[in-house]
Every structure is written in structure tokens, then in C-alpha cells.
Amino acid sequence: MSEYIETVSTEDANAVIDSKLRKVFDGRIVRKDLTKKIKEGANVPVYVLEFLLGQYCSSDDEDVIETGVANVKRILAENYVRPDEAQKILSVLRQRGSYTVIDKITVNLNIKTDSYEAEFSNLGIKAIPISEDYPTKYDRLLCGGIWCIVQLEYEYVEEDKRRSPILIHKLTPIQMPHVDIEELKQGRKAFTQEEWIKILLRSIGMEPDKLNDRERWLLLARMLPLVENNFNLCELGPRSTGKSHIYKEISPNSILVSGGQTTVANLFYNMGRKTVGLVGLWDCVAFDEVAGINFKDKDGIQIMKDCMASGSFARGKEEKAATASMVFVGNINQSVDVLLKTSSLFDPFPPEMGTDTAFLDRMHCYIPGWEIPKFRPEHFTNDYGFITDYLAEFIRELRKEQYGDALDKYFRLGKNLNQRDTIAVRKMVGGMIKLLYPDGEFTKEQLEEILKFALEMRRRVKEQLKKLGGMEFYDVNFSYIDNDTFEEHFVSVPEQGGGKLIPEGMCNPGQVYTVSQGKSGMIGVFRLESQMLPGNGKFERTGLNSDGKCKEAANTAFNYLKANGNRISGTISTTTKDYIINYQDLQGIGMTEKLALPTLIALCSIALGKPTLSSLAVLGEISIAGTMLKVDELANALQVCLDSGAKKVLLPITSAADLGTAPADLIGCFNLIFYQSAEDAVYKALGVE
């Protein structure tokens, strides 16, 4: 019964929204199921289709809608120009003397003749004279062009061969020729926040009633690059979650670059032709399948970094400005837990991007794509929403407005946010205000909700930078302070509470975790697992492949044990037992060469049948003579220990002097256990006094 009441109340709420929409935004809305119905059979942009549907089907009377749909289909069939039929249509125009077409028209001013000329995209004709009334009335004709219904006439004059025989008799835009932003702001006042979110999501084709609040906000975040200039967004997640849909289908102002090779000339500036690339022509450039991004030019990523940071880039002798936002979407092939344990959430990027902290630091927002459900038919709406073109154009108009400083009235940002973090958070706050409250009217609580969301999206970037870049990005405890109460509130990311590489509780005897520098130069976690069998003193190592230095370090430990085993314990035998140790590089950074001390502890642990202390990370190394070696990059090593779940850290006394390089709150996270010799390290690791 309760389910029935809930369904009825949802239907009632939707009926209220539909009624308000028809009253406030008449002619600007369309029923989205009609779009789906016709789109399946017509290769015409969604925004053109929805404009026609808005003209003919803006009613709740099924008969009117049916007639309207038939009209739209007829208009598309008779008048839409397919590029492969352009010559046929020109021939029909010549025979009949007049013909009506649907095409994308761009108008240019010819300065030499002081006249306006039209260019037809699909029909492939240029320099067609057009009355100056049209570009004056419909300014979007001059800014990239719009789709129109055009009545053409054909009149060939023998005496005047220089004049075009094709004339424009009448032109009617079938995209919004002009968007009144004040009308939108006034219309927004008629709706609550929840109603407005539902309208926005239905306008991009989604059904909000099938999504929870968190999923709704994440889908709205995909619109941020369309509403903010120079906004850099990243979304990685499972397949079939619609990551690229909005940039390809919804906005005529964004372009989707499918993964693969691209060039600086195509993306930024063509030196030969002296023309600006995609970033100067579009509001948003989205890269699909980030794993495949590959610049033919060596300086491609450097120019991209420049553009992402400042909205400008230098090519040749001049600097070019570009307001385009950049979006990077791609697939994650493993579970988030596995990625968090073994690498970073930027793992799907190509190596030259995914490990470049300077590039990744320019990301303003990381949407957790794994939290968005895989889309099924019920996730797509059949209800009313804005005509896609109207949505895209008012979003474009809102790019001109700024709300980044709105949070200063009620809040200030915590100390852990540096300049880049602050810019990212302010951009997100401004963008979300434009989407949710275009009229600029919101409460302190509503602003706080946006601020928390923005801090989380940026912190996700910073957490991964900390993994890749160490102490340079240590400040990740993002917070905001209430100006009235002076209370500080901290914002975390949900996935950080996931499983750890170094587990809680006791390990099996012979199992040791060590943290040190791998082959790649990065610091990571390595696991040793041991076996002891009856035998004659053989020592076998697996997982080291043919790496001579790693094998040498392991042999150093076994030789040390043979020489000093009795000093550690009389029960350890290196003549009647065989030992096997498997070495694992848990984070894929290349095996460490500092294996002598961890190997010695693992051998003693399995030989004595005694596990190491719970949640222990072993740091440091010994030489063949048993001399202790200091820990390199101690602060970064301790940070990796913390991220990996270690609660106790075994350290050489020689590294005590370096603790001053690590922040006090980081050191406070551990029980530090110092050792003074190799034997002392074994005793303390096994918890023997």
C-alpha cells in the first residue's frame, strides 16, 4: 500500500512540474519520449528535432501530439538536406524555380562588397546573398550558424552571370534564434530546488525518479564544463554510464574527440594556415576513451597544460586565448578498491599523462563514475523537459556570469587548500549555482550543500596526487569555516575508507610487508610470503624474475642468517630445511632492491613459526655485514605506510634524525619501533623482548 501511495505522490509531483513548465516555458519544452521515437529513424541533430516537436507537439492532448509528430516526420522527409542528395535538390530547385530546405546556415559579412552572404552546410553552397535583416534579427547566424527552414528561389539572368542564381526568399530559424536570459531567471522562481533539478535532468534525457540524490548531483556535475569557462573535468568509470552522451548529443556547443591520435594543429593552432583549433571554436572539448589519447607532437601535452591552467597558449610569436573547457572521460577496467590499493584513480590515462602530477593537478573536478548506475531503458525519461537547444543556449549565456565569490559571504576555505584547489572549488561552486540557481537566489544551507560537493570533487584529485607525488601534495584535509560560528567542517571522499594493502590483524608466519623505492623511483608496498620445507638448506626466490640486484639482496639475507642464525635463535636451521620466498610488487612500480632486511625477518618468522606484529610495515635495509642503512625519503615512505593501512612502523635508529622532515600529525599516526641492529629488527618485528 505504501508503495502505491509513493507512486501516486510521485506522479502528482510530476504533473505539477509539467503544468508549471507549460505555463512558464511554453514553446520551450518538449516531451522526451517523442524525441526518442523520431530520433531512431532520422539522422538529424536532437536540438533540431526537439525544436520542431516544441512547435507542433507542445500540448497534453494526444490527438494534437499525434498530428504534430506526423507533421514533424513529413517536414523532415521532404525538406531535410542529406549531404549525398545535395546535387539532386539543387537540380529540383532549378527545375521548379523554388524549393524549401532544412539546413545549417552560417552568415558572413563580405567587406569588399559590403553585403551579407550565407553558407549552407549540407547543401554545400556558399556566397548566397541574404538580406541584412536576418543576421540583425538572429545574431546566432553570425556566431557559428543555426539550423533553419529556408525558402529558396532560382533565377538565372543571362546578362548578369556574376550574380548567384540562387536567392533566399524567406528564412525561419529552427533553433532558438535568441535566448532571453532574464526570462529564464524569472521562470526559475516558479520552481523548488528539487523540481528544477528534475527539469534539468529530464532536459538531458534522464529520468530523475530512477536516481537517488547523489546520482542526480553527479549527473549535474557533467554539465559544469558547459556552464563554466576553462573548466577541466575528469570522469572515469564503468562502461554504459553515459559519460560522453551530454557532450555529443545534448549541446551543439561542445565537440567529442574520440580517443586516438590528435595534433597540436587540430586542437590548438595551425601555424601554416594561421587558424585556431578546436579549443578556440568550441565551448567544450571532450576526449573520449582517455587511454587512447596520443599527441603526434612532443609539445602537445605541454601546450595542453598551459591551456588548462591559464586559458591561453603560445604558438609561434603570439599568445592565443581559449575559453574552452576540457573533459576527459574513459573506462575503469578494475574495481575502485583494487585501483586505490595498487595504483591511482588516474590509472586509465596514458603513462605520460597519468603519472604527470603537473597535468593532473590542473583537473578541477573528478566525478566518481563508478557511483553512477549502468543505464537501462527506464533511466531515460518520457516526461517534459527543455528543448535541448534552449537548454544548451541558456547554459552558454550563463558562461558570461560569475558566482565564484558567492561563498565568501557565509564561508571561507580551510588552510589545506592551495591556490589551484581554491580556483577549482570556486569554479565548481560558481558553476553549480548557475545550474541550480540561475536567478542568484539561494540560502546559506543550499550554498553549503554545493560547497561540500565541490570540495569532495577536488579532494579526489588531490588524494591521487598525494599517491603519485608524495609530500608535495600532503595537504588533503580539505575544510571550510563558517563565518558566523567559526566552526571548521572537514570534507572527505567516500572511497578512501576502502580496503588496505597492509591488513589489520595478525599475518601468517613468514609474511612481511615492506615499504621502499621501486624500480620506477616511486615508493610502494611489497609483500613477502614464505614457506619452509624439510630439505638440505636450499633457498628459492620467486617473483624476482631475472633481476640480479634483487636476488643479490635476498641472498645477502640468507647468508647473514646462515652466519648469525644461532645468535637469533638456536632453533633456526639453515641445513635441514629448505626456504621459499615469493616477492610481490603490490602497486606495479617495479620490484625494490632493498630486500635484505625484509627477507631476514620473513625467514626468521617462518623458521620460528611466529608472525610479525599486526599492521606492521618494515622500513630500512642492511648490508652484507649487517650494517643498518637509512631510509630514503622518510616522509614520503611514512605517507605510503599510512595510505596502505600500516599502524606500526619498524625504523632504523639512524633514521630518527630525519623525522623532522615529516609533518608531526603524520608521525602521530603510527607506533614507531626503532631497531639498532639486524637481530634487534627481527626481535622487534616478531614482538620478542
Predicted regions and their residues:
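Conserved ASCE/P-loop NTPase catalytic core
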Residues: 207-347, 361, 475-495
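Short, basic, glycine/proline-bearing loop/turn elements
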Residues: 201-210, 258-259, 618-627
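Extended, charged/polar low-complexity intrinsically disordered regions
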Residues: 2-203
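C-terminal helical "lid" subdomain and adjoining coupling/linker elements of P-loop NTPases
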Residues: 375-379, 405-481, 486-504, 590
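Dynamic helix-loop-helix/coil hinge segments at AAA+ ATPase domain boundaries and subdomain interfaces
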Residues: 183-217, 544-551, 630-633
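Peripheral, non-AAA+ core regions of ATP-driven protein-machinery
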Residues: 497-689
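Short glycine-/polar-rich loops that comprise or flank the Walker A/P-loop
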Residues: 231, 282, 322-325, 359-365, ...
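Phosphate-sensing "switch" segment of ASCE/P-loop ATPases
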Residues: 319-326, 331-436, 440
